[in-house]
Amino acid sequence: MKTPETLAFECETGNYHTFCPISCVAWLYQKIEDSFFLVVGTKTCGYFLQNALGVMIFAEPRYAMAELEEGDISAQLNDQKELEKICLQIRDDRNPSVIIWIGTCTTEIIKMDLEGIAPKLEKQIGIPIIVARANGLDYAFTQGEDTVLAAMAHRCPEYKHCTTNLKNRTDEMARIDNHTTNKSPFEASKLTRFNLVLFGSLSSSIASQLNLELKRQSISVSGWLPSQKYEELPGLGEGIYVCGVNPFLSRTATTLMRRRKCKLVGAPFPIGPDGTRAWIEKICSVFDIKSYGLENRESEIWENVKDYIQVINGKSVFFMGDNLLEISLARFLIRCGMIVYEVGIPYMDRRYQAAELLFLQHTCRKMKTPLPRIVEKPDNYGQIQRMHELKPHLAITGMAHANPLEARNIDTKWSVEFTFAQIHGFSSVRDILELVTRPLRRRGVITPGFRSLSKQTTGD
């Protein structure tokens, strides 16, 4: 098989494996600390959440299942009354600041009017209700977060209200009876002339590090979507610049631009030292600020991880496609000296990822490496045949194919691990390389000197 010399896109419209997007509850309920997620679905959805999240219901996590029964599907029960009972119980037991309903495949099939029921119920219970249809009709499981953030963007306060009256909350909160707050989501001291809002769910430590990196360039971040507290959602509107940190948030980006009239900063994503530097430089250029110190910072980090890079330099990797992080990870691994044969990706918004695709081409030219083949909606059967021919050193794949590929003597890494690991910013580079090199270390395909430096040498 010939490796293409130019950026080639293909769409196989085949069968591929990924998780259900309702899995976004796993990380979003921890990020939004005063929220409660209610998944409206069947027993299958409940079994998936129970197994995927690994939290026993006795631990009383801030999410729950509203299990559909035969009476719901046959329209013998009143959907509004049934959901009202559950939401009242949630209010009395947990008293969250917001309840987020997650629609599923079944609610789509039976045409359950969640958007029509939510406004009526939130007036009754005095708590805002956000409806997000994060169902299995999406292309990849990470798009669940995209759906939730796009729905949450509509509830962010209007930017002009934040500047004129700091005591006003969001418009939707004003419509809810008997539900007030003493804290403004947007304080005057936090407003800057740049008005930059970042969107994407990251751990608090990584978000703080990205804030600090921008602060070093004299740029203060106005807020994050999502915020840790629902009442702290950033103000949106004309004059606000928004920038994403994850490549699977195209729906949120579209909502912010078209519905909230924000200006999108099209930048590569801050994954790897090269991506983080390019991300910061792009934001600086939008605000006419000359960045400084980034080149030296990036060089120092590459020097600090050269032991890891020696392990994967010259090795080949094949992305089967699972979580929409594939383009950014491929670009980073090419910069580390790896050869990427193919990048399978369930779905790609070429407009939202335009800067990342250009950066991928730039990286390939810099490393004098042929551009990888990009396959949307890949056919897993065809990919396995191509891997049999190419014999890559490593396959980054979904869990469904890991063991079969290992049996074919191909080292694998679960792509879902990159979703939950800290991979953003300058400080997370070692964590990414730790994940990538672990399968090679497990087989002993490393030098003895490196083994003593690694944090983990056996098992996944």
UniProtKB/Swiss-Prot annotation:
It is an enzyme of class 1 (oxidoreductase). Pathway: Porphyrin-containing compound metabolism; chlorophyll biosynthesis (light-independent). Keywords: 4Fe-4S, ATP-binding, Chlorophyll biosynthesis, Chloroplast, Iron, Iron-sulfur, Metal-binding, Nucleotide-binding, Oxidoreductase, Photosynthesis, Plastid. Its cofactor is [4Fe-4S] cluster. [4Fe-4S] cluster binds at C20, C45, C105. Its main location: plastid. It is found in: Plastid, Chloroplast. Pfam families: Oxidored_nitro. The keyword Cell membrane does not apply. It catalyses: chlorophyllide a + oxidized 2[4Fe-4S]-[ferredoxin] + 2 ADP + 2 phosphate = protochlorophyllide a + reduced 2[4Fe-4S]-[ferredoxin] + 2 ATP + 2 H2O. GO terms for biological process: light-independent chlorophyll biosynthetic process; photosynthesis, dark reaction. Component of the dark-operative protochlorophyllide reductase (DPOR) that uses Mg-ATP and reduced ferredoxin to reduce ring D of protochlorophyllide (Pchlide) to form chlorophyllide a (Chlide). This reaction is light-independent. The NB-protein (ChlN-ChlB) is the catalytic component of the complex. NCBIfam families: DPOR_bchN (TIGR01279), PRK02842.1 (NF002768). This is Light-independent protochlorophyllide reductase subunit N. The lineage of its organism: Eukaryota, Viridiplantae, Streptophyta, Embryophyta, Tracheophyta.
